Amino acid sequence: MVVEVDDSGWGDLVGGAVIVMRRVGTNDKFVGEVPVEEFQGSAFKSKAYLPHVLRIVREGSVALNLTKDEPVHVCTGYILSEVRRSLANEGYRVILSKITGVTQELAEEEYIKHLSRLGVGTIDQVKRLRGFDSFLKWVLRDVDKRERFVKTGWKAWPRLKVGEKIDPKQARD
């Protein structure tokens, strides 16, 4: 059976990130969260989120009883780069993949729940806010209280905070 690994939240201004693993044939799943603090200050600069993501996938591998003969389709995103490298080095059948369908939808749903648990809003409010520009406007309406939800480690955050327009694709660089 195939196991898929996907993330959600890596490119979002607000919140941490969610990592999901799902065995396609049985729909067994494992979900882990990378807290927003991993994307702030020195933790972001040292890329503390990468080993955290690897720990989540290791825990998920145990929970799902992952075997080395199962193909592991891992999303192409940077946040999963250490996972791809480590699993491949350990002899797992890692396949770089664009994850779509049920696993991607699960990742998105879990990320929305993550933001709601953080206090960003109800699930419905978060769904309406979802998107770079909407999140930025929401944060800037009360930046003193809401900056704690932001990936402040992004180089662009100081400029975004004062209202400078930046291409969302370049904001986390």
Question: Predicted segment positions?
Answer:
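RNase H-like, Mg2+-dependent phosphodiesterase core
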Residues: 1-173
